[in-house]
């Protein structure tokens, strides 16, 4: 057999041996961009969608996941597991999930202030708190004009003046599942905590069961 014919025969045999393995390999479904599960309901928001961003499942096992808050400087995500009375943390670099705080007073919404401190709405204690950099908890609001709040739900910091806006519906006080069942003495409202004086003022009580808050960049 000539050398060229021998090499051709060997190459063909190797291809035949490898081909079945390649054909039976368990190929994963390729990622499609943009992710088909990310849908834009209002065309005005199309420009905010990142075309190469897929939806990922970070964790399972919570009873009611709420209030995600991203810490870009620490590369971790916090969120509330309200009925389990805990705050969870996901580390971006390792994917590890652990308990950040428990008990957490049935915390719901979270945000960060201009100094990077965590601000939280607590159903169980009917208050809005701030976690200082040393871990100490500061109460920002637990009443309005001397009357206990209902169950602060969501919170956001105003981009212009640093005021802390929060909603106060009744959800966390209706039953013990998401807080502590109790009487309601205030009309469900949206409030603002002044960044300078710390005083709480009512913004409106004309929104039925106010919940999520967000300010547009402009």
What are these regions (language model features)?
Residues 1-7:
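Twin-arginine (Tat) signal peptide motif
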Residues 7, 14, 23-218:
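Sequence-structural signature of mature extracellular/luminal beta-sheet repeat domains
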